[in-house]
């Protein structure tokens, strides 16, 4: 509770990056490559991570302007729709 209060007092908040339902989960969806390192500044719409499913590559974008705080999934790790890949802190 205190963390939430501190977050709102400073004006920043944490925003998750979630694997969307792409209809490709049956093809073995996995993180292929992180395009942005932890602690890096991003703008909403910047490509931050590449997912791969079979021969299909999908880039996911930063949901907000801010900073990538933590990557929660390693490269080559399998993922599924709804899984949180990373957290961003708003600027």
Protein language model features and the residues they cover:
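Short hydrophobic beta/alpha edge segments that flank linear recognition/processing sites
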Residues: 42-61, 80-91
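Short flexible/disordered coil segments
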Residues: 37, 74-84
């Amino acid at each position: 509770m205190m963390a939430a209060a501190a977050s709102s007092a400073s004006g920043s908040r944490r925003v998750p990056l979630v694997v969307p339902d792409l209809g490709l989960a049956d093809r073995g969806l996995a993180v292929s490559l992180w395009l942005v390192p932890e602690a890096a500044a991003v703008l909403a719409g910047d490509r931050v991570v590449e997912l791969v499913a079979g021969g299909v590559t999908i880039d996911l974008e930063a949901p907000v302007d801010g900073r990538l705080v933590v990557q929660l999934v390693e490269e080559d790790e399998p993922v599924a729709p709804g899984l949180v890949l990373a957290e961003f802190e708003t600027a």
